[in-house]
Amino acid sequence: MKAVVSKLYCSSMEEVMVVRRRPHVVNGGGFVVTDYKEKIVFKIDGCGVLGTKGELVLRDSDGNDLLLIHKKGGVVQALSIHNKWKGYSYDYQGSPKPVFTLRDPKHSCFSITSSIRISVGPGNCYFDVKGYFPDRDCSIVDSKGNVIAQVKEWIGSRDIYKVVTKPSVDKAFVFGVIAVLDYIYGESTSC
C-alpha cells in the first residue's frame, strides 16, 4: 500500500496498537494510541478539546498535527444521502492538502447501503469499512478485498481496544479513519 499521510507511519511488519479512550470530563474526550511498548504514537482530539463540532485532529506523539478531519456541511450536504468527511494533511510549507474523503450513509429510510467508503487521492483508490465499529469488530479493506487493518475488542473493556495493522500500511491514515468512526458512532471524539 502506498503511504496516504506519510511513509514515516508505515511499518515493514504487522503491528498491534492499543487505543485508550479519554473521558470527556478529564481531557475533553478523544483517544490515545500506543504501541506494544506503551509508547504514545498518536493522539486524537475531537470537539471536546477543539470546541468545534464535526472536527477532529490526529497528532503525533510530540503533538504535531498530522491530519485535520472535518465533516462537510451546507445545503448540498443536507440534501445528500451520505455524510461526507474530508481529511487533510499538511505539506512541508504547512498548507493543508486533501488526503481522503470518507462517506458514511446518513441514518434514514432512504439509505440504500450501509457501507462506509473511503476514497484516497486521485484515481479510483478506495477502502471500505466492513463490520460494526461499536462492537470493536470491523476491518478496513482495500479495493482488492485485502484487510489492511482490524479493530478488535479488548476483553472486558469498552474504553480500550486494539487495532492490528498489516505491513506497509500507513497507520496515520488508519487512525484518521478510526477517529471518524469514533465520531460517527457518538463515542469519545463526539460532542
Curated annotation (Swiss-Prot):
SUPFAM superfamilies tied to this protein: Tubby C-terminal domain-like
Entry-linked InterPro entries: LOR, LOR_sf, Tubby-like_C
Similarity comment text for this entry: Belongs to the LOR family.
Described function: Might be related to the phospholipid scramblase and tubby-like superfamily of membrane tethered transcription factors.
Name of this chain's protein: Protein LURP-one-related 6
Organism: Arabidopsis thaliana (Mouse-ear cress)
